[in-house]
């Protein structure tokens, strides 16, 4: 490898392997044998373990390698891509329940209800796999970036949740993590002494700070891109990416058909939880002032009274993902911005 093999993802497995699966069945290999073979492949993806620092191991909850496999979705012509191998991939994962492969299921209005149910049954096992990706949002998103419709329909997932166009693009798809909760913290500190501030003012200040720090993030990301080009070209990988040979350019020099880096907004659920608690306890219930809340944060809730406040913030107010639109929409507004 030209890298550390992290996030060596396998793309739309059920698409490109389906022909071989069907051919084996026609040639007399039993479904049971093929199921065992696929199970062994899933187990094999757990052989490679990246050595991480203790902090990284804590952050990643172990040593995942990001062997992500994408299932379902659409064909390039716009039909549902779900097939019998899609089902088998989930069935075999249910048998092993290991950290890898990291399965991702693409859903859209054409998805078979039975496959959607199979996906839900697998999630219910509690491993956090598979992840769900919404074609109705992602495909138009790629179109907005100048990607052709056929290529946009053929996207896959790489690493954790990053989106890519297999064989057609190079990008540091996880080049930066934009901490939305940190932006909220900055905004609270900037306004803690303003006794007339409203909740809407806080939201607008958060958006203004997003603009400010996104620009800094872009500058930093451009430096990383340039550094990769100058100090770490990857000629072997470039041989397998469309247009690189024709252009005579390494992927780090922009030789691929599509070239863009990816960033992630993180802390979305925490942002919703925090904004909702802020709205309730400061602006609606008026139990404490904004300054008192920031002071509690600065002290890390040390002391009896601050501990009571911490317990109330955790337990009293609804949280993201519990069918409360008011909570969920707080982060939706920020993300759409």
Q: What role is predicted for each listed range?
A:
Residues 1-337:
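Conserved catalytic cores of very large enzyme subunits
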């Amino acid at each position: 490898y030209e890298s550390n093999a992290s996030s060596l993802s396998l793309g739309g497995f059920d698409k490109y392997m389906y022909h071989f699966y069907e051919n084996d069945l026609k040639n007399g290999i039993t479904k049971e044998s093929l199921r065992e073979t696929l199970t062994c492949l899933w187990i094999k993806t757990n052989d490679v373990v990246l050595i991480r620092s203790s902090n990284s191991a804590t952050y990643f909850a172990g040593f995942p390698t990001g062997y992500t496999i994408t299932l379902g979705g659409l064909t390039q012509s716009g039909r549902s891509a779900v097939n019998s191998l899609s089902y088998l991939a989930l069935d075999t994962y249910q048998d092993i329940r290991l950290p890898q492969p990291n399965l991702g299921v693409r859903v859209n209005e054409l998805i078979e209800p039975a496959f959607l149910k199979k996906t839900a049954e697998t999630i219910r096992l509690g491993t956090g796999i598979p992840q769900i990706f919404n074609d109705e949002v992602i495909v138009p998103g790629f179109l907005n970036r100048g990607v052709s419709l056929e290529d946009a329909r053929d996207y896959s997932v790489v690493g954790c949740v990053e989106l890519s166009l297999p064989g057609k693009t190079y990008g540091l798809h996880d080049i930066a993590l934009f901490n939305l909760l940190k932006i909220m913290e900055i905004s609270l500190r900037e306004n803690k002494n303003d006794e007339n501030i409203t909740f809407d003012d806080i939201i607008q200040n958060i958006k203004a700070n997003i603009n400010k720090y996104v620009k800094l993030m872009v500058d930093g990301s451009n430096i990383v891109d340039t550094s990769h080009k100058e100090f770490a070209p990857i000629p072997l990988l470039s041989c397998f990416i469309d247009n690189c040979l024709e252009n005579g350019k390494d992927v780090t020099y922009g030789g691929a058909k599509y070239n863009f880096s990816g960033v992630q907004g993180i802390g979305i659920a925490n942002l919703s939880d925090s904004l909702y608690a802020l709205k309730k306890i400061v602006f609606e219930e008026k139990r404490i002032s904004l300054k008192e809340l920031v002071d509690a944060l600065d002290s890390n809730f040390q002391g009896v009274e601050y501990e009571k406040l911490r317990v109330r913030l955790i337990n009293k107010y609804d949280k993201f993902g519990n069918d409360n639109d008011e909570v969920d929409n707080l982060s939706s507004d920020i993300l759409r911005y």
